[in-house]
Each structure stands twice: as structure tokens, then as C-alpha cells.
Amino acid sequence: GGLSQCTPKKPLIAAVDGYALGGGCELALSCDLIVANANAKFGIPEVKRGLAARAGALIRLPRQIPRHVAMELALTGRFITAERGYELGLVNCVSDGAALDLALELAAEIAGNGPLAVAASKRVLVESRLWADAEMWSIQAEILDPVFESDDAREGATAFAEKRAPL
């Protein structure tokens, strides 16, 4: 249970300063975005103790980085640096300072967008990998059509035309 097995509607940002190993790495992997301090390290070293990562890393990691790299990390228990995580697409950005500051900036940028659009975009991104090609456009329309018919969308279009930020 817990955060590693649910998909909240609101975006989750992991701010990693230092080590995210085992459960910490699995918690970060359950987030939508990961920002890290330059000194951060990620890994699932459970195999070194005769265990296996069971809070989602073995499921999520090969969906977020190349399968062979995920296999290497899971089978050896090795760590990767924040920079390597960035190169692999696991980490969104690396900060020289506190990761929390960068995460708060990113959160503020997201919060400045239309909440319905953000929630619907996240839902499509998360759920679409399960959709068959024959149904993907109709399911996406079911989720996104209400966004385009919302007050947020009307205000966004008006603000764009008037060259101002949405209210």
C-alpha cells in the first residue's frame, strides 16, 4: 500500500538530496517528476542483502530508463549518480543547491497552469500505456474534452488573445 502503489491526481515531485536507496528510490520512482542535488545517488541495493525491491522499483524502473540499465541496477545493487540519472531520463533536473528549492520552483510553475488541464494531462500520460491502438483516441477524448469545455480553457484563450497571464 501507500504512496508507492497509488496514483494521486495531483503531480508529485521528488526532491532528492543525498541518497535515495531501496525504499527511498522506490518512493522517488513513484513520483511524476524527480529533481536531485548534484550529490544525490539512486539505487535498489536490496539484492546485496538477499532481498528484492518490492515497493515498485522492479516495475517502474524499466519503464523509466532503458531495460538493460534497470536490469543492471536491480541485479547488482549498484548506485547511479544524479547526473547519470539525468542522462537516462530518470531525473528531470540536477541542482547545485538544495533539490527542494528546485522542486518548489517546478511546483510553482505547474501550479500556475490550468488545474483541470494538468490533472487530465497527467491522467492520459499515466493511463495511456495500457490503451489499445483502436481505442486510444476515443479514451483520450473522454478525458480531455471536458478540459476544452471548461472555464479554465476559455480564460486561457482570452488571456492569450489579450497578451496577459490567465486569472
Residue ranges and their predicted role:
Residues L12-I13, A20, I34-V35, V94:
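Short, well-ordered beta-strand core segments
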Residues A28, L61, G85, S121, ...:
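Terminal peptide-recognition signature
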Residues V35-A40, A82, V91-I139, D145-D151, ...:
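C-terminal long alpha-helix characteristic of the crotonase
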Residues G22-G23, A40-P45, G97:
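Short glycine/proline-centered loop/turn elements that form peptide/ligand docking sites
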Residues V16, L61, V69-R78:
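Short helix- or helix-capping micro-motifs
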Residues G1-D17, R49, I59, Q64, ...:
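An acidic, glycine-rich surface segment that forms the CoA-thioester-binding/catalytic face
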Residues G23-I34, A38-N39, A57, A82-R84, ...:
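Active-site-proximal glycine-rich helix-loop-beta segment
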